[in-house]
Amino acid sequence: MDDFGINEMLDMQKALQEKYKDKWKPICPDRGKDQLLWMIGEIGEVIDIVKKHGGEKASQEAPLREHLIEELADVLMYYNDILLCYGITAEELKQSYIDKFEKNMSRW
């Protein structure tokens, strides 16, 4: 897995949602807010690791680094759920990202 892109992550999230469709609420715009809140909770867990141990230690020490990466993966899973909730495709996200990048590159 040399390159891990948005389409692959979206496909994995769709598979996860399908597996638990009888236990979880369906993916739809109304669920987007809940997924945003869950994602913020996961971001808080990332912040706790860095705040408690410092960025250098969190990025260098193996067990702590693994925990940091796991929490960042949780953030990405919720992020991809949010994209699914609002029907945002990888192509739309890519174009918006490029547009924002170009805007930021020309700011100063």
For each predicted feature, which ranges?
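Flexible "arm" and connector segments at domain edges
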Residues: 1-108
